Structure formats: C-alpha cells, structure tokens
Regions:
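N-terminal auxiliary interaction/assembly segments of multi-subunit proteins
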Residues: 1-169
C-alpha cells in the first residue's frame, strides 16, 4: 500500500508539469480525464515520446530506490497541431523537422516535475528521451511496474500520458 501512495504522490508533479508546458509552449490548456490502469503495451497514440528516470526517495528516514518511466503519446493529427503551434509553421505529415519535438516536450515535463519531486524528497536521474512512431506501436515498460494511462483533451486534440513507477527494495 505504501508503494501505491508514493505512486499517487509521484504522479501529480508530472500532470501539473504537462499542463504548465502545454499552456506556455503550445498555448493550449490540457484537461486531464479519468486515469486508468493500462493492461497492455500498445500505445494509444501514433507517436510516443519516452523518458525513463530513476533515483531515491526518503521513506521515513530510509532511502528507497525507485524506477519510473513517462510516455506521452499523440495521435498524428494532434502531434502535427502541437508542432505547428510550437514552431510557428504548418505541419500535416511526419517529417524530420518535427521528429524530436515529442522528446523535447517529455524532457521539459520531466525537468519541471523534478523540481517538485525534489521538494518531496525524491532524487531523479533522467535518461535521454526516445521517440517511437507508427500505428499500434508497443512500449517496453520497466519490469515490475504498473502503468497508469491519463488521457488529456486539448484544443489541439487528445493525447495520452502513461506513467509507471516501482520501488526497488
């Protein structure tokens, strides 16, 4: 149960950071929908930005290791609209110019979340973001994690945040 409580506490900074990044960089509000536990590895979007992180959390004076991963997935149309809003050009197809944009977004979200996580007693080491593109692509989550899927609505369309977290004893 303690791990579940830490997961809930761990999730909030990522949701808040995503909302902030989209308001300031994409000029669009994100409206979080009801989270669900994800039971498969298939992405809900066509383009996914993936970033792993690990670190320690202080639990009642005892250091506990954790590992986590954040995925933000976009349907193609949403990704093109987000790219257009951020870069000031119109995109209607997946081109090299916008390939890394999702990675930049997920990097900014995790960077913003890290500040709040630090205030909550977490240390965080970030991996390098990676991008996965294609209909019905799969995401490989860290072993032993449960994945929470948080759908978001925005003026640019829907997108999906997937977050997994586990404490390593």
């Amino acid at each position: 149960m303690a791990g579940e409580m830490h997961f809930i506490e761990f999730s909030k900074p990522f949701i808040d950071a995503a909302k902030n990044i989209f308001e300031t960089m994409v000029f669009s509000k994100l409206d979080a929908q009801k989270p669900i536990i994800k039971n498969d590895s298939v992405s809900r979007g066509d383009i996914s930005a993936v970033l792993g992180l690990s670190g320690e959390v202080d639990k009642n004076g005892t250091k506990c290791q954790y590992k986590a991963m954040l995925v933000i997935s976009f349907p193609y149309e949403t990704y093109f609209k987000v790219a257009s809003a951020m870069l000031g050009e119109t995109y209607t197809s997946y081109v090299p110019d916008i390939h890394d944009l999702g990675g930049e977004i997920v990097n900014m979200v995790v960077g913003n979340a890290k500040r709040e996580l630090k205030n909550m007693g977490y240390t965080s080491n970030m991996a390098i973001p990676s991008m996965v593109e294609g209909k019905s692509h799969s995401i490989k989550y860290p072993a032993g994690t449960h994945v929470v899927l948080i759908p978001f609505n925005s003026s640019n369309g829907e997108l999906f945040m997937e977050l997994c977290y586990t404490e390593v004893e």
